């Protein structure tokens, strides 16, 4: 308010001065008025107000131009942790969704898989460079919650527990969890609760299996958690657990790579895969969701899924 008053006073000085130049009869009054106003508005104050108003106006114009440019892309106004980048947290031991590449990986990321290619396509639409940070599954969820990563894609399925700390996108794939056992084992879907089960720590497989029998689980005493699916499967091979609950796509990869393992008939549970951002980051959630839906509508997501998962 003070700045506005000073600016008006400064403009009054100019007006009075111009009037004084155009009329001799008012020159005396104009001189007195100009002197009085000038005593209130020093050159320094006038300069400061003019400078600040110009700066604010320029900033406002710049902001409006930036917003307009972003909105033109159809993704709204959003920010990421590092300007120009989309940082994705994942656990790259979950084939075919994410795995470490032997070479440069997809688009030079060092990684490959369904989630890697989908995230790369999303980043392209948002005009960002994709950076992938590999870590344990639990750590990937925490990284997003602590703003160390923008988004998590890691064969991540929705759960009410996760929804309390993360904001999810729409689902882009269906995940079916199955049970891996040794060939000739007496383990069945019906007697799983009597066996020792291996799971990947932090996954819905672990959450559901370790829940109480009243809630459909087997209890924590019947579940061993491992940092990743590969370690859980190795525990099965070594006889440390009787079965492993894991998603169907990686289960097939692990069974193919380990002789003597098989998948029990039937599905243990079916769920949807999503991406997720930190709770409350609605702008980024909407931007990613919009890009993701465009990729589903134009068939890109299905092409990526078909590339890695062959229908039987």
Q: Over which residues does each language-model region extend?
A:
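A ligand-binding cleft/hinge motif common to bilobed small-molecule-binding domains
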Residues: 139, 156-164, 208-211, 235-270
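Acidic, polar ligand-binding/catalytic clefts
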Residues: 120, 129-192, 262, 267
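Extracytoplasmic small-molecule ligand-binding "clamshell" domains
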Residues: 71-155
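Extended ligand-binding regions for polar small-molecule ligands
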Residues: 116-125, 185, 191-204, 275-312
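Bilobed "Venus flytrap"/periplasmic-binding protein-like clamshell domains
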Residues: 88, 94-95, 109-124, 156, ...
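Periplasmic-binding protein-like
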Residues: 92, 173-181, 248, 252-293, ...
């Amino acid at each position: 308010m003070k700045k506005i008053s000073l600016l008006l006073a400064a403009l009054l000085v100019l007006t009075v001065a111009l009037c004084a130049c155009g009329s001799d009869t008012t020159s005396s009054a104009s001189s007195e008025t100009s002197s009085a106003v000038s005593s209130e508005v020093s050159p320094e104050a006038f300069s400061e107000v003019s400078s600040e108003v110009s700066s604010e106006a320029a900033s406002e114009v710049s902001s409006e131009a930036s917003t307009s440019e972003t909105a033109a892309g159809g993704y709204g106004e959003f920010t990421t942790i590092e300007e120009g980048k989309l940082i994705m947290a994942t656990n790259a031991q979950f084939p075919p969704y994410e795995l470490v590449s032997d070479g440069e990986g997809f688009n030079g990321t060092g990684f490959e898989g369904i989630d890697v290619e989908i995230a790369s396509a999303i980043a392209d639409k948002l005009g960002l460079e994709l950076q992938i940070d590999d870590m344990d599954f639990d750590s990937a969820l925490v990284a997003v919650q602590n703003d160390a990563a923008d988004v998590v894609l890691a064969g991540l399925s929705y759960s009410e527990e996760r929804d309390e700390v993360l904001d999810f996108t729409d689902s882009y794939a269906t995940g079916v969890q199955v049970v891996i056992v040794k060939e000739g084992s007496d383990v069945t879907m019906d007697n799983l609760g009597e066996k020792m089960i291996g799971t990947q720590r932090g996954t819905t497989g672990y959450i559901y299996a370790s829940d109480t029998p009243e809630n459909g689980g087997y209890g924590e005493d019947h579940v061993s958690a491992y940092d990743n699916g590969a370690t859980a499967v190795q525990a099965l091979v070594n006889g440390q657990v009787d079965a492993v609950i894991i998603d169907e796509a990686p289960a097939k990869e692990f069974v193919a790579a380990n002789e003597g393992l098989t998948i029990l008939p039937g599905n243990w549970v079916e769920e949807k895969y999503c991406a997720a951002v930190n709770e409350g980051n609605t702008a980024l959630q909407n931007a990613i969701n919009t890009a993701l839906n465009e990729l589903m509508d134009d068939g890109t997501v299905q092409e990526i899924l078909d590339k890695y998962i062959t229908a039987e």
